[in-house]
């Protein structure tokens, strides 16, 4: 299985994927090595560079939205969410699902904005599918690899989390079961209804009642 490496000077990073049969040449100069480097000898490293530049552009765009004083907080959050979803959809279609066995597809799954992964394998059902696709492909091409097993574990854990959230949502939408509602230590109140008949609160358990207090 391929291994991943980083060349780093300060906050300038070059990501590489190396196969044991490859000889890779990297040329770069500080302080713009993250985007200005050239790499030869590895098609995958060239693809990873392409992905890294796309991620840098995405991050710059998101920061621009956050710093725009003309956009309110809610609108900014909504715009950022839409931009990220568009980015993920593009990466899935053009990289991950196209060649899930590639090191670049593995790399794409773990791209981040700040401390947050772009692909969310804990809560997003669609993102979990992407992790599962790469995991299955790596099982075929790199059987027994630690990275492939890690992807499987992430996908399985994500599916468990999604099921738990779906069950909780279903329970909340069903409402409260009246048979599970119990009363204790309540203050007994007796009031006349609109027909002049006295009604006690304890007589109305399980019923919807409108109380109209007026002077």
Residue ranges and their predicted role:
Residues 100, 122-126, 143:
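Structural signature of alpha-solenoid helical repeat scaffolds
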Residues 83-98, 129-139:
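Amphipathic alpha-helices of TPR/Sel1-like and other helical repeat/solenoid scaffolds
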């Amino acid at each position: 299985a391929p291994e991943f490496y980083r060349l780093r000077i300060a906050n300038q990073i070059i990501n590489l994927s190396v196969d044991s049969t490859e000889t890779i040449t990297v040329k770069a100069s500080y302080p713009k090595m993250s985007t200005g480097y050239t790499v030869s000898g590895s098609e995958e490293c060239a693809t990873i560079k392409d992905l890294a530049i796309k991620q840098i552009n995405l991050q710059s765009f998101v920061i621009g939205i956050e710093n725009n004083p003309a956009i309110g907080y809610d609108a900014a959050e909504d715009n950022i969410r839409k931009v990220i979803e568009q980015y993920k959809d593009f990466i899935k279609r053009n990289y991950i699902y196209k060649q899930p066995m590639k090191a670049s597809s593995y790399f794409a799954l773990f791209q981040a904005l700040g401390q947050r992964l772009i692909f969310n394998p804990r809560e997003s059902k669609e993102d979990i599918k992407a992790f599962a696709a790469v995991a299955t492909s790596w099982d075929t091409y790199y059987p027994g690899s630690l990275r492939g097993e890690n992807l499987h574990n992430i996908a399985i854990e994500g599916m468990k989390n999604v099921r738990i959230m779906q069950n909780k949502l279903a329970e909340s939408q069903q409402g409260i079961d009246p048979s599970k509602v119990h009363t204790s230590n309540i203050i007994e109140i007796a009031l006349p209804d609109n027909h002049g008949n006295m009604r006690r609160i304890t007589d109305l358990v399980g019923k919807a009642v409108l109380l109209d207090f007026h002077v």
